[in-house]
Amino acid sequence: MRQKGWGRIINFSSSAGKNISTVGGAHYTAAKAGILGFTRHLASEEAKYGITVNAVCPGLINTEMVKNTINDDDIKKYANSFPIKRLGKASEVASLVLFLSSDEAEYITGASLDINGGDLMI
C-alpha cells in the first residue's frame, strides 16, 4: 500500500467499544475499545502514504452469532429499543465497508463509523 501510495484499512470494532456490551463481558468491551485506539493511531501514521484507516462499529446485526447468543425474546426487546426498531443486516454493514474501500472515501481517516440503528443516540 505504501509503495502504491494508496490503501484502505478497515478494522471492525463494535458499539461495545464505545459503550458497554449487552452480551459480552468486560474483556470484549476492552478489546473493541482497543481497536478504536489502534485505528486512530495507525491512521495518523499512514495518512502521509495515502492510506486511510477507519473502524466500523456495528450494533446488533442479524447474524447467526446473534441468534445463537441472544434468545428471541431479548432480540425483539433490543430491536424495539432502537429508533429504527429492527436489527441491522449484514448487507448494510457490507455497503459501509464497500464505501470506505472506495476512492470516494479518501478524505475519511481515523474515523469510527457507527452502524447500529441509532442505538447509541439513546
For each predicted feature, which ranges?
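Short C-terminal tail/terminal secondary-structure segment
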Residues: N19, L98, T109-I122
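Alpha-helical segment proximal to the catalytic Tyr-Lys
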Residues: S44-E45, E106
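Short, flexible catalytic-loop segment of classical short-chain dehydrogenase/reductase
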Residues: C57-N68
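Residue(s) in the substrate-gating loop at a strand-loop-helix junction
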Residues: S14
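A short C-terminal helix-loop "cap" of Rossmann-like NAD(P)-dependent dehydrogenase/epimerase domains
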Residues: N68-F82
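A conserved structural motif in NAD(P)-dependent oxidoreductases
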Residues: F82-V93, E104
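Active-site helix of classical SDR
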Residues: A31, T39
